[in-house]
C-alpha cells in the first residue's frame, strides 16, 4: 500500500500528516482553521485518500504558517507514498462545478514542481481563513511533492463555491494521476 507519515515540527507549527493514497476517503482533520478542515475533508473524500492532518499552529498570529506548513507536509507525504511512481497514470485534468463556479485542475506527476494558479477571490476571508493562503497551500504542496499543477477557476461568484470546486477538482486530479494503470514508468526517459 502507498502510505506515508510526516511529522513536521517548527517554532510556528507542529503537524502530523498520515496519507494512504489507496484508501477509501476517510478523513481525520483538525488544523485549527475551520474552513481548511472542510476543504481537506472534501479532498480526502473526493480523492478517496485516507488523510489525517493534525496541526497546532500559531494562528494567534494568522493562518499563513499553518496553511503553508500543512501544504508542505501533505506534499511530502504524497511524494513519498508514491515511491518510484512505477505504473501511475501520471497525467490528469478534471473539471468540477460547484453550483455557479467551475474549475479545471490539471496535474503532471513529473518530479518538476511548477504551479499555475489562475483564481481570484472577492473576499479576504472565509471564516478564519485568508483567501490569499489558498495559493500558498498549493505552492507549498507543489514544491514538496514535485508535481506540475495548473489550477484554473473558469468562473464563479461565491468564494466558498469557487474554492470548493478547486479542491474537489484537485482531489480528483490527484487520484486519477496517481492511479496504477500499467507496470511501466510513464516517461520516455524511464524515470519520473
Curated annotation (Swiss-Prot):
EC number of this enzyme: 4.2.1.19
Any one Gene Ontology cellular component term annotated for this protein: cytoplasm
CDD domains documented for this protein: IGPD (cd07914)
Subcellular location: Cytoplasm
InterPro entries documented for this protein: IGPD_sf, ImidazoleglycerolP_deHydtase, ImidazoleglycerP_deHydtase_CS, Ribosomal_Su5_D2-typ_SF
Reactions this protein catalyses: D-erythro-1-(imidazol-4-yl)glycerol 3-phosphate = 3-(imidazol-4-yl)-2-oxopropyl phosphate + H2O
Pathway linked to the protein: Amino-acid biosynthesis; L-histidine biosynthesis; L-histidine from 5-phospho-alpha-D-ribose 1-diphosphate: step 6/9
UniProt entry tagged with the keyword Protein biosynthesis: no
SUPFAM superfamilies the record matches: Ribosomal protein S5 domain 2-like (SSF54211)
GO BP, sorted A to Z: L-histidine biosynthetic process
Keywords: Amino-acid biosynthesis, Cytoplasm, Histidine biosynthesis, Lyase
Gene Ontology MF term list: imidazoleglycerol-phosphate dehydratase activity
Family: Belongs to the imidazoleglycerol-phosphate dehydratase family.
Protein name listed in UniProt: Imidazoleglycerol-phosphate dehydratase
Source organism per UniProt: Clostridioides difficile (strain 630)
Name of the encoding gene: hisB
Amino acid at each position: 500500500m502507498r502510505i506515508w507519515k510526516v511529522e513536521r515540527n517548527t517554532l510556528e507549527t507542529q503537524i502530523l500528516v498520515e496519507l494512504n493514497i489507496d484508501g477509501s476517503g476517510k478523513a481525520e482533520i483538525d488544523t485549527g482553521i475551520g474552513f481548511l478542515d472542510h476543504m481537506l475533508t472534501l479532498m480526502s473524500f473526493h480523492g478517496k485518500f485516507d488523510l489525517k492532518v493534525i496541526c497546532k499552529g500559531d494562528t494567534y498570529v494568522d493562518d499563513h504558517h499553518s496553511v503553508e506548513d500543512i501544504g508542505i507536509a501533505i506534499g511530502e507525504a504524497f511524494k513519498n507514498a508514491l515511491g518510484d511512481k512505477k505504473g501511475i497514470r501520471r497525467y490528469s485534468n478534471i473539471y468540477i462545478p460547484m453550483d455557479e463556479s467551475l474549475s479545471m485542475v490539471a496535474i503532471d506527476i513529473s518530479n518538476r514542481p511548477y504551479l499555475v494558479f489562475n483564481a481570484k477571490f472577492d473576499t479576504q476571508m472565509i471564516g478564519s481563513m485568508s483567501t490569499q493562503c489558498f495559493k500558498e497551500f498549493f505552492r507549498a504542496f507543489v514544491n514538496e511533492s514535485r508535481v506540475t499543477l495548473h489550477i484554473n477557476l473558469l468562473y464563479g461568484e461565491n468564494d466558498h463555491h469557487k474554492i470548493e470546486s478547486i479542491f474537489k477538482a484537485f482531489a480528483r486530479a490527484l487520484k486519477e494521476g496517481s492511479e496504477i494503470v500499467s507496470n511501466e514508468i510513464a516517461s520516455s526517459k524511464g524515470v519520473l
